[in-house]
From Swiss-Prot:
Site entry (Important for oligomerization), positions: 155
Function noted in UniProt: Secreted, cytolytic toxin that forms pores in host membranes after proteolytic removal of a C-terminal propeptide, leading to destruction of the membrane permeability barrier and cell death. The pores are formed by transmembrane beta-strands and are approximately 3 nm in diameter.
Species of provenance: Aeromonas hydrophila
Signal peptide span: 1-23
Cysteine-cysteine disulfides: 42-98, 182-187
Pro-peptide region(s): 446-492
SMART domains, sorted: Aerolysin
Modifications after synthesis and translation: Proteolytic cleavage and subsequent release of the propeptide trigger a major conformation change, leading to the formation of a heptameric pre-pore that then inserts into the host membrane.
Protein name (Swiss-Prot/TrEMBL): Aerolysin-3
Length: 492
């Protein structure tokens, strides 16, 4: 009986594992192929499409069939052409819809970033929109592949050549040169590519710095006093603690005005360089140029536990220092922008999902950069092209059938290539700090010594401090709220 239960459980587990292994996979219509080799017979490295797969992309398959065509599927099913409303039912046919046994997902490759040298905002934009190989031609071919007409100038027969780039408000317009004559229907109505709504986001991981100029610590003040034991017994169970607040003065300059346009997506902490410890934060969604200096304050302390013989005193010395650091820095800012295609669509074939044939004027905007919405995202539409009705904009399957998968992948990779602009400047900081509290050899005392300028502190057990602290002088050196205390040690 126990064996039967175990066997039943094993069968259930096996069934679950098989169900997981057979989870549905997307069928990309651009990879479907019709073979006329007989019922349920496909070419090498292809297999028949089953009923469920055909149903998931039925509109795409029917769109590729003749009016009264009937073609086979796997397991004794057929799919019928638009004259039969794409009905799928049991039957047989001499041709078969097939799909690769190892289909390519056709993902858009991610290229390395296109780095633009540092400059002001107009410099950065100008360099991008005038780059023929990396920008003008890829965006022109995108418009051409989608079905826009006349994406080139009058003096060239090739897409993306003889293009004019003009300033348009805060953006730029790329359009084929219209000088001289041209032949063809509405050849003077050149497709335009508008580049606008530029935005720049700081990449904190891109930080680099040049040669660091860092001073050795410079002694600015030495404070000397005494720890005095007036009692008849040695004192060693007390901590002498110096506490103070100190500010690190820092500043940064930005070489070009682009920094005013650069924002931080998340809270940004300035990287530590050298020995100067500094905590600088720029809040999320703030301009990089909104904070070019400051004096963050840090509370610090130093302690020592001296042993003072009876009726003795030991010298106590505190040294105060300052240090400074400076270096050139560079960050990268991710550049995003809107790409608006405007023109009329070719009647002989275009990729708008309804494939109009009346040459309509069409405007469409893609966002190159962070995701905004489905309508403007090339990557979203491309990745969901296997779901009929989900992408109500461009028929990317059609572009693949017309131009080939590798061609479209290569073009879209160039269009979506990340763009980064350099942000450069100079950074400097100065900080103050105290060295260790140093103690010297004990000296016998005949009587307590008092000074009007000394800080006289007692632990109440015979140990007291006489150390001169001039608050005004120390504040001028960058040390505030300075205090000395003598307290019983917590871990005697």
């Amino acid at each position: 009986m126990k064996k039967l239960k175990i066997t039943g459980l094993s069968l259930i587990i096996s069934g679950l594992l098989m169900a997981q292994a057979q989870a549905a996979e997307p069928v990309y219509p651009d990879q479907l192929r019709l073979f006329s080799l007989g019922q349920e017979v496909c070419g090498d490295k292809y297999r028949p499409v089953n009923r469920e797969e055909a149903q998931s992309v039925k509109s795409n398959i029917v769109g590729m069939m003749g009016q009264w065509q009937i073609s086979g599927l796997a397991n004794g099913w057929v799919i019928m052409g638009p004259g039969y409303n794409g009905e799928i039912k049991p039957g047989s046919a001499s041709s078969t819809w097939c799909y690769p046994t190892n289909p390519a997902t056709g993902e858009i490759p991610t290229l390395s970033a296109l780095d633009i040298p540092d400059g002001d905002e107009v410099d950065v934009q100008w360099r991008l929109v005038h780059d023929s190989a990396n920008f003008i031609k890829p965006t022109s071919y995108l418009a051409h592949y989608l079905g826009y007409a006349w994406v080139g100038g009058n003096h060239s027969q090739y897409v993306g050549e003889d293009m004019d780039v003009t300033r348009d408000g805060d953006g730029w317009v790329i359009r084929g040169n219209n000088d001289g004559g041209c032949d063809g229907y509405r050849c003077g109505d050149k497709t335009s590519i508008k580049v606008s709504n530029f935005a720049y986001n700081l990449d904190p991981d891109s930080f680099k710095h040049g040669d660091v100029t860092q001073s050795d610590r410079q002694l600015v003040k030495t404070v000397v006093g005494w720890a005095i034991n007036d009692s008849d017994t040695p004192q060693s169970g007390y901590d002498v603690t110096l506490r103070y607040d100190t500010a690190t003065n820092w500043s940064k300059t930005n070489t070009y005005g682009l920094s005013e346009k650069v924002t931080t997506k998340n809270k940004f902490k300035w990287p530590l360089v050298g020995e100067t410890e500094l905590s600088i934060e720029i809040a999320a969604n703030q301009s990089w140029a909104s904070q070019n200096g400051g004096s963050p304050t840090t509370s610090l302390s130093q302690s020592v536990r001296p042993t003072v013989p009876a009726h003795s005193k030991i010298p106590v010395k505190i040294e105060l220092y300052k240090a400074d650091i400076s270096y050139p820095y560079e960050f990268k800012a991710d550049v995003s922008y809107d790409l608006t295609l405007s023109g009329f669509l070719r009647w002989g074939g275009n990729a708008w999902y309804t494939h109009p044939d009346n040459r309509p004027n069409w405007n469409h905007t893609f966002v190159i950069g962070p995701y905004k919405d489905k309508a403007s995202s090339i990557r979203y539409q491309w990745d969901k092209r296997y779901i009929p009705g989900e992408v109500k904009w461009w028929d990317w399957n059609w572009t693949i059938q017309q131009n080939g998968l590798p061609t479209m992948q290569n073009n879209l990779a160039k269009v979506l290539r990340p763009v980064r602009a350099g942000i450069t400047g100079d950074f400097s900081a100065e900080s103050q700090f105290a060295g260790n509290i140093e103690i010297g050899a004990p000296v016998p005392v005949a009587a307590a010594s008092h000074s009007s300028r000394a800080r006289n502190l007692s632990a109440g057990q015979g140990l007291r401090l006489e150390i001169p602290l001039d608050a005004q002088e120390l504040s001028g050196l960058g040390f505030n709220n300075v205090s000395l205390s003598v307290t019983p040690a917590a871990n005697q």
